[in-house]
Every structure is written in C-alpha cells, then in structure tokens.
Amino acid sequence: MERQYKVGIVGATGMVGQRFVTLLENHPWFKLTVLAASGRSAGKSYEDAVGSRWAMTTPMPESVKKMTVLDASKVEEVASQVDFVFCAVNMPKDEIKALEEAYAKAECPVVSNNSAHRFTPDVPMVVPEINADHIEIIPAQRKRLGTKRGFIAVKSNCSLQSYVPALHPLMKDFGVSKALVCTYQAISGAGKTFDRMPEIVDNVIPYIGGEEEKSEREPLKLWGHIEGDQIVNAEKPVITAQCFRVPVSDGHTAAVFVSFDKKPTKEQMLEAWANFRGPAQELNLPSAPKQFLHYFTEPDRPQPKLDRNTENGMAVCIGRLREDTLFDYKLSLIHISEPTRPEPI
C-alpha cells in the first residue's frame, strides 16, 4: 500500500486505547495522528493523561508521549485531522451510539471495539476470517445516516473470538447444530490488571454481566446474511454459554461441546482447521496471523501462559479434541480475544 492513512483513537487513555497505541506503532499502513479522550484528559500530553495507568507489557511508545490529547466530544476537530478513527470509549451505550454516529455523520469512518452498535441491523460486526462480506451493508447504512464516506463497523464480543473461528470451517460440510460453551476469561477483558482487581486473586467469579447473552446471540449475526438494508441473523446453531472471570492476565480459554448435522471424523476436523485461510490471510494484512487456527496435540495444551502469544496473539489455539458422551465432540481453545486485542489490521 503506497498511501499511509491518518488515524485517530477515540478513548485513547483506557486499556483498549493503549492496546491500539501499541499495535499502531510503526504500522506500515496507518499513521497515528490524533489521540482523543474525555474532557478530563484533553489538553494534557498523552503521557500525563495516562499517568500510572499504562497497562501494556511494553513501554509507552516515545512517539506518542508528548502528543496532546484532544477532547473526544469535539467531533469536528478530531474528524478533520484523520481518515478514520478507532473507537474504544468507556461510556453508557446510548452515549457511545450517539458519539459514533456523530463521527460517521462528520464523514469520519468509525471502527469500534464497543458493543453499542453490534445489533444495529445495518452495522457490520466483522471477524475478517468469518464474514468479511458483511461490509457490503455499508452503502445501506450510509443511506440511513445520510453520509457519503462515514460509516460504523464493529468487532464482536471477546468471548466468542475463539470458538466461532474454530467452528466456522466446519459449518459448510458438516453443519453445526448446537454448542455448549464455557468461557474462562482473563481480567484484561474487564480492562483490569491484578493490582486493579484484587478480588480476582485466588478466586473465580462465575458471572460477567451481559456476557452470556452476547456469547449466544452474536455468533448468529456473524453467520447471518445481508437481506435488503439489514443483516439477518442465522437461525442456528443453538448456543448456550456460561462465562467465568478467572485470575489470568491475558488470554481467554473456552471449553466447547458441539454437535453436527453430519458428524465429521476427527481427521476431517483437523484437516479443516489446518487448511483454513480467510481474507485476512489471503490479503496478507500486516498484523494477520499466517496460520489462523493452530492445533496442539499435547494433552495439556493450549494454555494461556504458554500459547496466548502464538502469531503475535492473533491466532486461535485449539486442543484436546475428543468424542463426547452427550455431544459429538468436545475441545479446548485459547485466544487473546479480550477487548484489548482488535482484529487484524
């Protein structure tokens, strides 16, 4: 790509915004031009605005330390300086919806990590390897918003970015009929570190607000189809989920039990995973994993501590595939799929 796009981060001081800062450092396609946050941070240098809250494992890039943080609510000021923004604000959903639409109506495309617009019928919720074709809904969204260039696209919830990619290559030939999913989600998914979440030490919390509903509903939008001016959800598979917060810093784990319309052999499943390539791989996107799905043969893998950084944290790690007494198969998965890890860019 010859052109370098100017990008901004709206919500730059939070944990998700910090992750964007690290991922965009030295990115060949994008130049980080604007950092925006709440009015409390506006006018400060990024280093001062973040202060002791820098939560990444790598140091804050020198290139952003002295950048002046802008007020995210001053939409025109931010939008006029960038080609598009990544949005990672922490606000009530109605306020996020309004803010993201304001940026889109200012002809500034929005790529959002937030959940506010995930079920807006004409907003694509995209996992590039799964449903890149859903971006074709954008002209219909632009018509509704009255924009020529602006639009909103969102990423899916963190809990499903391991098991949906693992099931997807099996859908066409075998048909997934139902799945039971238990997720064991790292504290970074809550935007926390251990020193900011002492209640998780030596503990498991068997509830994450809203997470189970998202884990059951959002895959159906990802597997849905465009019909007119909206995305229509798929009718199956039926998914039931239980979500736990566990004392792990990064990397969500999932235990998945799955049944098929036509039961595959174990060898067919392994072959489907090994051969799967999505648009992100075909386009050779800078941060896309070369091999999206990795299968581990060891009986005690995958593990978050050992495997979460496979392919720079962008791969899905699968293991322990075996037949089940109630479902056809059961398996384990690991992915750094928390909100601080966006899709390949």
Task: List PLM regions with ranges.
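Histidine-centered active-site/metal-ligand motif
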Residues: 27, 252, 335
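Single conserved hydrophobic/aromatic residue that forms the stacking wall/gate
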Residues: 334-345
